[in-house]
Amino acid sequence: MSNKVARRLGKCLFVSGRRFESRQSILQLRTETLTDTPLSATLDQSQFSMFKAAEIVNAAAACAEAECIEQLKKTDVVPLLMNYLLGEEQILVADPTAVAAKLRKMVVGGAGKTVVISDFDYTLSRFANEQGERLSTTHGVFDDNVMRLKPELGQKFVDLKNKYYPIEFSPNLTMEEKIPHMEKWWGTSHSLIVNEKFSKNTIEDFVRQSRIVFKDGAEDFIEALDAHNIPLVIFSAGIGNIIEYFLQQKLGAIPRNTHFISNMILFDEDDNACAFSEPLIHTFCKNSSVIQKETSFFHDIAGRVNVILLGDSMGDIHMDVGVERDGPTLKVGYYNGSLDDTAALQHYEEVYDIVLIHDPTLNVAQKIVDIINSSH
């Protein structure tokens, strides 16, 4: 890691709404602890000794809306989570005060007011394996398997990626300039799949042999959301069938709280691919414009005013747009790029509330859900 990034990741502490530059400056607060909080099992025990209960409650009361104060007095675990976030070198929080305010509202609202909207590729799935080798996306499942079975067709998928991938991430093009290229890339790729008439069984087998890997803790995270009846909306510009088959193979079944907004392969009566769902969803149109208003999605998230958004690209930051609500959106972004690209890293800090650098886990998302559940 560069020194510049390391300096920006300084180990600050967040206690009672204030930011401390070193652990020494809060030693005077070590009079009472919060060891009865449900998060005690997941946070370092030494952190609990750094908090004065009265200080935390008073700060929470000052910042919270009047009707929330009594609930916050019972337990306020937000400072504990903030201290964890700000103490980890691989986590960036540009505006701790704003993040703490969003977390407090979510804690008060509880699980019944929460919905998780998440990307899949490189968000719920890992970007690289332990050896640093890049893993597959849902579209990449076809790239890998078709190249093995039908090299000529496989090369067409590779050629498309080589042509359009640099355009997708070009810093010299606006999003509006990129969109026609993304539509062409996705449309051509989908046509290749349909024209080959891949069977459902073949695609399921592709998934079994794929290089898609869950992030560490992903299975527990998804199961925890289901257990607490928190809807999980997987919003992907990839191929939704691949995600469904992957979840079925890893979890045994699709959890009842899980919804998919993605490009779905349609099959004919012989279970062969015959078309893709409309409208086409690419990287830069992941918002309400591609959601059918009559779907169960809108019914199931009615009243879910607090959104936890998980993504890994600029195209993911608007996944909550169009969802009717008046609560906060906490945006958590996975940064998989180079640490030397400080401009890109800074951009992530500007659009995501919390930035996780090269994080192969869902630990932060799990901790957020834990504190929401712990207060009710």
Curated annotation (Swiss-Prot):
Keywords: Cytoplasm, Hydrolase, Magnesium, Metal-binding, Nucleotide metabolism, Nucleotide-binding. Disulfide bonds: none annotated. The keyword Nucleotide-binding applies. Its EC number is 3.1.3.5. The keyword Cytoplasm applies. It catalyses: a ribonucleoside 5'-phosphate + H2O = a ribonucleoside + phosphate. GO terms for biological process: nucleotide metabolic process. InterPro entries: HAD-like_sf, HAD_sf, Pyrimidine_nucleotidase_eu. Substrate binds at E168, S189, S236, A237, K286. GO terms for molecular function: 5'-nucleotidase activity; magnesium ion binding; nucleotide binding. Gene3D superfamilies: HAD superfamily/HAD-like, Pyrimidine 5'-nucleotidase (UMPH-1), N-terminal domain. Mg(2+) binds at D119, D121, D312. Pfam families: UMPH-1. It comes from the Eukaryota. It is found in: Cytoplasm. This is Putative cytosolic 5'-nucleotidase 3. It comes from Caenorhabditis elegans.
